[in-house]
Design a protein with these regions (language model features):
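Non-catalytic C-terminal accessory modules of carbohydrate-active enzymes
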Residues: 6-17, 23-180
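Glycine-rich phosphate/pyrophosphate-binding loop
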Residues: 1-3
């Protein structure tokens, strides 16, 4: 039923890699606390993984710097990308990495920091700009946890919970997040 029936088996939503669904799966893994699996899936979906050498790029058949909507499983075309430039998957990839894995969520003038990362990551840093205000964020993971925030500091002061009220002004804040 529907348009999927028009695709041969192994093409697009009919048994191939449907990138939107793969990204939503990665987001679900992060939300359940499985940072290892979330990052594994995101790396699999990354188009650059199809461009490790000239032969791979040629076989992939679409731009390796653009998210493809799908990757075929059709015999004779296995691993070829399709529908690049026509997909909203890039925005989902961005949200999956930033909001779900790195844990930076901005809502209603507040910034929530709740990373879900592989246990092998000792931490990471990122910068977030809100108007003219810059938040230099350092996440520390000394115990090798996949999730869980022990404390958050902004400019050397502990923050209650893991939420920071955003402000506007020509200022730079240093934020430290300790996982554990």
């Amino acid at each position: 039923p529907g348009y999927i029936k028009g695709y041969p088996p192994g093409v697009r939503e009919n048994g191939g890699q449907y990138t939107h669904a793969g990204l939503w799966m990665a987001m679900a893994m992060a939300r359940k606390g499985d940072g290892e699996r979330a990052v594994q899936l995101l790396r699999m979906l990354n188009p650059i993984e199809h461009a490790r050498d000239a032969e791979s790029v040629w076989h992939y058949g679409v731009e390796p710097y653009v998210m493809a909507a799908d990757v075929y499983r059709l015999p004779g075309r296995i691993g070829q990308g399709g529908w690049s430039w026509y997909t909203g998957a890039a925005s989902w990839m961005y949200r999956a990495w930033v909001e779900e894995v790195l844990g930076l969520q901005v809502r209603n003038g507040r910034m929530l920091l709740n990373p879900v990362i592989p246990v092998t990551w000792q931490g990471f840093s990122l910068s977030y700009r809100h108007g003219e205000t810059v938040y230099a964020i350092q996440v520390e993971n000394p115990d090798g946890c996949e999730r869980g925030v022990v404390w958050v500091e902004m400019d050397g002061q502990r923050v209650t919970g893991d939420v920071i009220s955003l402000e506007r002004g020509l200022v730079k804040h240093r934020v430290v997040v300790r996982m554990g």
